[in-house]
Swiss-Prot record:
Catalytic reaction annotation: tRNA(Asp) + L-aspartate + ATP = L-aspartyl-tRNA(Asp) + AMP + diphosphate
InterPro entries cross-referenced by the UniProt entry: Aa-tRNA-synt_II, aa-tRNA-synth_II, aa-tRNA-synth_II/BPL/LPL, Asp-tRNA-ligase_1, Asp-tRNA-ligase_1_N, Asp/Asn-tRNA-synth_IIb, AspRS_core, GAD-like_sf
Region (Aspartate): 207-210
Organism: Leptospira biflexa serovar Patoc (strain Patoc 1 / ATCC 23582 / Paris)
Oligomer and partners: Homodimer.
Annotated protein name in UniProt: Aspartate--tRNA ligase
GO MF terms, alphabetically ordered: aspartate-tRNA ligase activity; ATP binding; nucleic acid binding
Gene: aspS
Amino acid sequence: MNQWVTSEYKNRISATSVSDASVGKTLFLSGWAFRYRDQGGVIFIDLRDRSGILQIVARKEILGDDFSKVEKIRSEFVIAVKGKLSLRDADSINPKMETGKYELIAESVEILNSSKTPPFTLDEFDPSGEEIRLKYRYLDMRREELRDRLVLRHKLTFALREYLDSKSFLEIETPILNKSTPEGARDFLVPSRLNAGEFYALPQSPQLFKQILMIGGMERYFQIVKCFRDEDLRADRQPEFTQLDMEFSFVTEEDIRREIEAMWAFALKKVFQLEVNAPFMTMPYHVAMEEYGSDKPDIRFGMKLVNVSEHVKSCDFQVFTGAITSGGVVKAICVPGGSVISRKEIEDLTAWLSRDYRAKGLAYMKHGANGLESTITKRFSPEALEAIAKAVGSKEGDMVFFGADSSKIVNASLGALRLKLSEKYDPPKVPYSFHWVVDFPMFEIDETTKSWTFLHHPFTSPKEEDFQKLRDWKDGKEVDLSSIGAKAYDLVLNGTEIGGGSIRIHNPEIQSLVLEAIGIGEEDAKSKFGFLLDALSFGAPPHGGIAFGVDRIMMLLTGGTSIRDVIAFPKTQKGTCMMSEAPGPVEAKQLEELKLRVVTI
């Protein structure tokens, strides 16, 4: 490498920092050769760095012998260029490029490194599959789309830190290696070499430690932290993910929500120039489930679920009356303009809802010139059909779909159908919509074990007015635990839960009762959470908090289809890294040191 290059590093500028004030000045740039065009005696190179692209013009009459170096340059070679900035001729200006009216007339060129031919082109419109892009992630990062998302991710976390620092929050690190505790998903376990037969668990969240920080008097804590869950992966899941974790002392639910709204308003305006109107709408959990079929509803469009049980209870259609007499419900959604949906499409939708949501069928009526029409309308009185149309707000050209079963199945299936059909028939009216879901139940029945479990986590505080119900349950009285409310809240953006939190239990008695209600007795609780239970007895302040999925938020704000789109080195849906080939086997010696043996089951 020529000495002139290293001596110029301190003067290096970025490709997109050029301006009219730079015209005529000698500049030094380095980066990758993106596009290369040889026009005989003149070679045009699009030099790309992290900021963007600037066109380099290499002329033989200016470079002399150095022109032979330029002729050797190929795609993704690393190069350094020194030259004068010039304005392009009017007919060669590229309005699609940020620097499209400038070009650098090269006076010195150096090849800093060569490159193999990339296995895919690095144009943003390249259709290469995700698998090959994950394998060569370092090449994928050079593409504008991924690069911009990673830059925006940095800016967002920086803005969040800036806001929280201004509000007296302390960024405090919590342990990565801890004991395994039940938090709703499987733990990643790490064997201890020094304590043979014992294991650490990677944290699913810093939940216990951030509560202990409040007991320790830190009052306001945050951390942008890696968390780990060994669970089956979907488009919005990764085995390791990033949370913005927060905890406050001496606050109410409303105090926390107002602070969070101000934080997101600040960060989104600063990074995305997005105006957020606060306070956000608040929706009770039961309304979300009854009207949208989801605890994280997308409220940017209509098609609400409407309970029509009262209107159809006297009809002659056994599917509906049977569901009602069995304690279930009949609900409907109106699809604007949906009468064009074909029978084949309806059959496909029915099969999907049956397979994924256990729906027994999908009844439907089209709204024609004379009202609701279908093969089943003869089983309903004219008054009932008119009442249904009025309840769902249908008009000519619309389609009404019905679900008849238990509330749980109907809500889930029609909620999913609502989301699927909205894409075509009732698209969102606004690009972004934030709202809170509140008033969650504290407990629900686990369908697998048929025992009580928590909806959020076992450290969420019940509502004060329900404390006595827990005490009565402990005393053997008949208590429906599902009637106990939780001081919990979720923040939803565009139908995706981006954050969840609660006021925590700071009373040791209530904490023990909650753990006992979900089947964790005194000895078991001491074994799993002894250090927290002990800490609660030393003057724990009232406190609460929230955690946000940074990956998920970035995906929504940048138009990604998966959180893999906004993570530098993501895992596949099988939990593997295509680039490093993790996970992989380890040497026998390492297993021996850990007192472990691999067996085939």
